[in-house]
Regions:
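Conserved beta-strand-loop-alpha-helix junction that forms the acyl-donor binding cleft
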Residues: 109-125, 130, 137-140
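Conserved acetyl-CoA binding element of GNAT-fold acetyltransferases
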Residues: 72-85, 90, 146
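A conserved beta-strand-loop-helix scaffold within acyl/acetyltransferase catalytic domains
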Residues: 64-72, 135
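A short beta-loop-alpha structural element at the N-terminal edge
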Residues: 2-18
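Conserved acetyl-CoA-binding loop-helix of GNAT-fold acetyltransferases
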Residues: 87-101, 122, 126
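Active-site rim helix/loop that mediates acceptor-substrate recognition in acyltransferases
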Residues: 30-50, 100
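C-terminal "cap" of GNAT-fold acetyltransferases
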Residues: 137-154
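Conserved beta-hairpin
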Residues: 49-64
Length: 154
């Protein structure tokens, strides 16, 4: 097993879009109406300096990054294939490491997650994100999404 993280390349967006978890595909469409390749490319371009790919045996199994709102606030995102959590402990350790690095740069991270995406919600809670409210009609499909955040000084 060779599981590691590197800076993303544009082609990672297309490669990952073919194997994305069904929950991520559903969340992408519900929030934006976009297909996986469009959403990944947009996320990559919006967070290029803070965009990373998770690799497993030479294949992209996940991408994540931070879209910067301003010098204090960022929007974290992560999309992955079913293989992303194949090695749960390694994935969790890397998640904490990169989250701590992001928290060194931003005072607040926030975003929204589809209420149906229970695996992502559990993962976010395990990383210390707080869920503030349920938005009953969010995004393109007007589905329920949770707002979540993590603040440096709370």
């Amino acid at each position: 097993m060779n599981y590691y993280i590197r800076h993303s390349k544009k082609e990672d967006c297309y490669n990952l879009s073919k194997t994305l978890r069904k929950e991520d595909v559903q969340e992408i469409f519900s929030s934006s109406g976009e297909n996986p390749a469009q959403a990944l490319l947009k996320a990559y371009l919006c967070s290029h300096k803070h965009c990373f790919s998770m690799m497993l045996d030479g294949n992209v199994v996940g991408m994540f990054g931070i879209n910067e709102i301003n010098k204090n606030v960022g929007i974290p995102w992560l999309m992955g294939s079913p293989d992303l959590t194949k090695y749960k402990l390694e994935f969790y350790k890397l998640s904490i490491e990169y989250l701590n690095t992001f928290m060194d740069s931003y005072n607040v991270l926030f975003n929204y997650v589809d209420q149906r995406n229970t695996q992502s919600i559990r993962w976010l809670k395990s990383l210390g994100f707080k869920f503030t409210k349920l938005v009953p009609e969010y995004g393109y499909e007007r589905k329920p999404f949770y707002e979540f955040f993590k603040a440096k000084y709370v």
